[in-house]
Structure formats: C-alpha cells, structure tokens
Amino acid sequence: MEEKVESTTTPDGPCVVSVQETEKWMEEAMRMAKEALENIEVPVGCLMVYNNEVVGKGRNEVNQTKNATRHAEMVAIDQVLDWCHQHGQSPSTVFEHTVLYVTVEPCIMCAAALRLMKIPLVVYGCQNERFGGCGSVLNIASADLPNTGRPFQCIPGYRAEEAVELLKTFYKQENPNAPKSKVRKKDCQKS
C-alpha cells in the first residue's frame, strides 16, 4: 500500500502525492539542480508533474541568459505552456492539476507566478531564508491576496540537507559574472 504524503483540493477534487512519487520526482529535481551547478548557476531544479507526467522542468538559467527572471520555476512554466500548446490542452486546466517539485523554496517572484497559475501543491527541499515566498520571508502561498490567483499548499523539507549542500558549494565559487572591482589599491612603498 502506498503511503500518502499530502493532499490539497483542486477544482475537481483532491490532489494527492505519495512518498514514492515525491522521492521519484525530487530525485529528478536534484539532478536538475546539479546540472545548474555544473553550469555555474544557483543550483535549483524543478519539475512540474501533471497526471504523473513531467510537462515542464527547469533549472536556473540566470547567469547563462543574463536574465534575472530565468529561475527554474519560470523556465518550467514556459515549458508547461509549450506542452499545452503542442497537446491542445487548456493551460489553466493543466496548471490547476500540476504539482511542482523543487529543490529550494520558491522565491517571492516565483511563488507569485505559481499562485497566478493556480498550482495547487508545491513540494520543496530547503527553505530560502533570503527570498522565500512560501513562508521564510513572505507567505505568498497562503496569504489573503485579492485578485492574485489561488493560494497553494506547500510541503517543505524533502532532501533539504542535500539542497543546502548544493547551495553551499555554489556560493564557495567565484561568480564569473560579477562586475570587476572598482576599488583602487594604493601602492605601498617602504620608507
């Protein structure tokens, strides 16, 4: 018997995920995060799963594209929209039945986008203490925000330690896109 992790209500009934599904999809999200790290990106990876099928996936592409909005979730949202177009599906119907699996708590921008898309459930790894939009900084996920889509359920903490270790590895590196320092060093002469 499959152990159920969580459920939330969608327009057509409950959205339920099992421990086995969560492990399977979070493994793939971690793979995406590692791919981001290999490409000198903040290591965040995600999958959007509709009817047990990955319809969108993403990893951060901010440094690669020089576009600050290309977070993993935004890349995945674009892929879901493309999938809907290719399969003749209504994006609103698909998003209302899609679960997001992501290695790090979505930032405020991404949480707002997920809410507007009416994603019912987000499963994430570690908290985002600086920019988290699911409770760490702001709670976009469940706040009473008129005309901003539908609140969504969050399940935090899946493989959080692994996600934190990936982030630590990234932040130990030098950022090749950081601007050159404009501080001039004085010449020191011995007297």
Curated annotation (Swiss-Prot):
<comment type="function">
    <text>Probably participates in deamination of adenosine-34 to inosine in many tRNAs.</text>
</comment>
<keyword id="KW-0819">tRNA processing</keyword>
<feature type="binding site">
    <location>
        <position position="107"/>
    </location>
    <ligand>
        <name>Zn(2+)</name>
    </ligand>
</feature>
<dbReference type="Pfam" id="PF14437">
    <property type="entry name" value="MafB19-deam"/>
</dbReference>
<comment type="similarity">
    <text>Belongs to the cytidine and deoxycytidylate deaminase family. ADAT2 subfamily.</text>
</comment>
<protein>
    <recommendedName>
        <fullName>tRNA-specific adenosine deaminase 2</fullName>
        <ecNumber>3.5.4.33</ecNumber>
    </recommendedName>
</protein>
<keyword id="KW-0479">Metal-binding</keyword>
<dbReference type="GO" id="GO:0052717">
    <property type="term" value="F:tRNA-specific adenosine-34 deaminase activity"/>
</dbReference>
<dbReference type="GO" id="GO:0008270">
    <property type="term" value="F:zinc ion binding"/>
</dbReference>
<feature type="binding site">
    <location>
        <position position="71"/>
    </location>
    <ligand>
        <name>Zn(2+)</name>
    </ligand>
</feature>
<feature type="binding site">
    <location>
        <position position="110"/>
    </location>
    <ligand>
        <name>Zn(2+)</name>
    </ligand>
</feature>
<dbReference type="InterPro" id="IPR002125">
    <property type="entry name" value="CMP_dCMP_dom"/>
</dbReference>
<keyword id="KW-0378">Hydrolase</keyword>
<feature type="domain" description="CMP/dCMP-type deaminase">
    <location>
        <begin position="20"/>
        <end position="145"/>
    </location>
</feature>
<dbReference type="InterPro" id="IPR016192">
    <property type="entry name" value="APOBEC/CMP_deaminase_Zn-bd"/>
</dbReference>
<dbReference type="InterPro" id="IPR016193">
    <property type="entry name" value="Cytidine_deaminase-like"/>
</dbReference>
<keyword id="KW-0862">Zinc</keyword>
<dbReference type="InterPro" id="IPR028883">
    <property type="entry name" value="tRNA_aden_deaminase"/>
</dbReference>
<feature type="active site" description="Proton donor">
    <location>
        <position position="73"/>
    </location>
</feature>
<dbReference type="GO" id="GO:0002100">
    <property type="term" value="P:tRNA wobble adenosine to inosine editing"/>
</dbReference>
